[in-house]
Amino acid sequence: MSETKPKYNYVNNKELLQAIIDWKTELANNKDPNKVVRQNDTIGLAIMLIAEGLSKRFNFSGYTQSWKQEMIADGIEASIKGLHNFDETKYKNPHAYITQACFNAFVQRIKKERKEVAKKYSYFVHNVYDSRDDDMVALVDETFIQDIYDKMTHYEESTYRTPGAEKKSVVDDSPSLDFLYEAND
């Protein structure tokens, strides 16, 4: 008979939930406002493993290692800051909560990094590169400059909202049963 291998989960959700419950109980019992109740190592290790695992997801595979390290750091920070909001009486899946906090932090980091890259490109195009200087034109490849222009305009277009982009109220054009309520003459 074939024996199934146990599935390896890098974070045990039940142990993590129990650690969070213990930490929040200790936090609630803390009477001294100057005393900081630290999260234990189980929670910290789980947050680090979840952030590291999420960085390997296909959504984030194309980013450089430096961006990924920044994303992981932001994810860990967001998870630690927001873990006190986790309602252990209502939800039993802290892994999903931490993953969502990390995911949102990753997306915010990507937006921030893209904005910084757009600033660098804009500075280069407007202050460094001079198309009227023959020496500069000879040094710089035209496809490189065109690529920078394309990336810069793509970012600028993504930040502007078109006037018709606001959410409109949905008008229900589906057939109604109002004709049943009309009074017969």
Swiss-Prot record:
Residues 114 bind DNA. The record marks 70, 74, 77 as: Interaction with host RNAP. Keywords: DNA-binding, Host-virus interaction, Nucleotidyltransferase, Sigma factor, Transcription, Transcription regulation, Transferase, Viral transcription. InterPro entries: T4_sigma-like_factor (IPR046386). Residues 114-153 are annotated as: Chaperons the template-strand ssDNA of the transcription bubble. One of its GO terms (molecular function) is DNA binding. One of its GO terms (biological process) is late viral transcription. Residues 13-113 are annotated as: Interaction with host RNAP core and recognition of the promoter specific element. Changing residue 97 to A: 65% loss of transcription capacity. Belongs to the Tevenvirinae RNA polymerase sigma-like factor family. Interacts with the host RNA polymerase catalytic core formed by RpoA, RpoB, RpoC and RpoZ to form the RNAP-gp55 holoenzyme. Part of the transcription activation complex containing host RNAP, the viral RNA polymerase sigma-like factor, the late transcription coactivator, and the sliding clamp. Interacts with the terminase large subunit; this interaction may load the terminase onto DNA for packaging. Plays a role in the transcription of the viral late genes by acting as a late promoter recognition subunit. Associates with host RNA polymerase (RNAP) core and thus replaces the host sigma-70/rpoD subunit in the complex. May also play a role in DNA packaging by interacting with the terminase subunit gp17. This is RNA polymerase sigma-like factor. It comes from Enterobacteria phage T4 (Bacteriophage T4).
